Amino acid sequence: MQINIEKNQKEIKAHGNYSFPVNVSVEKIEAYEQGAFLWHWHPEIELTWIMSGEMEYRVNDQSYLLKQDEGLFGNSNTLHAGFRQGSKECSYLSITFHPRFLYGYDNSVLQEKYVAPVTEDERWPAFKLEGNVVGHQRILKWMQEIYEIWEKRPSDYELEIHILLMQIWQKLYRYVTRQPEQGQMSGGQLSRLREMVAYMEQHYNQEISLDDIAEHVNICKSECCRFFKKHMNMTIFEYLMFLRIQKSLPLLKEGESVTKTAGMVGFTSPAYFGQIFKRYMKCTPKEYQRN
């Protein structure tokens, strides 16, 4: 399983609908291929609570290690990915909702005074919710209450969820507006990073050179390497290999030969594909097919 995305890395999945733009679900990180969901973004705000295990959650150029009973606020339109940590299974609660669910209609006081100052602030792509911080505990508790309401679906569950999300937002708003500025990437840098990731997503099955990627975002090769490594905590080559292996998994499961799969995901040598596959998956392509 993997997240479905458009060419620009935007997630295709609907998070609720126009009349009630909220989605609540319990996910398992190990359900995703390689124990990771790939980089994507969506206009919805996302709240995460770790129910068991651990996860590395990356948002733009920041990395957060989330343990059981900790959580994360992920802002609207941020590029993010999640990676399993250790051998234990990791289950987490995900609550996604569109900002308009908070403010109602464009240019309202709620939007301009309380929502936009947070969702449009590039300094706050995310922040961690600690289980031992009183204010954070309250937010995490409200998140759990939302899940319970979602599961039971009382007759007024939409109203109850709206009230709890407004309480959560009030806490988040006060927290963000009272904190000193953080050193985060600018909107232009985020746009460049999205373009680089999207380019590899669109061309992973072709021969891609550093020149191609640098030219696509209009920077020199050395700056291209430095920029990607700084913000993604991995080299361009490492990300491309990771992406290609991810793309190979459903093909192998469908019964494609190793040789054909290698070519379909951008490897010119089946032997090299097998070598990289084993590095990431700890087994050969044939062993993966059998299991």
Language-model features: locations:
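Generic protein-terminus/edge-of-domain signal
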Residues: 1-71, 77-79, 86, 110-113, ...
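Short hydrophobic/aromatic patch on the recognition helix
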Residues: 69, 223-228, 272-273, 277
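Ligand-binding loop in jelly-roll beta-barrel domains
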Residues: 77-102, 110
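Amphipathic alpha-helical segments enriched in hydrophobic/aromatic residues interleaved with Lys/Arg
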Residues: 108-167
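N-terminal positioning helix adjacent to the helix-turn-helix/winged-helix DNA-binding module
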Residues: 135-138, 142, 164, 188-196, ...
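Solvent-exposed, amphipathic alpha-helical segments
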Residues: 138-152, 192-203, 247, 251
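Hydrophobic recognition helices of helix-based DNA-binding modules
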Residues: 150, 169-172, 176, 200, ...
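Terminal helix-turn-helix DNA-binding modules in bacterial transcription factors
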Residues: 198, 202, 207-214, 219, ...
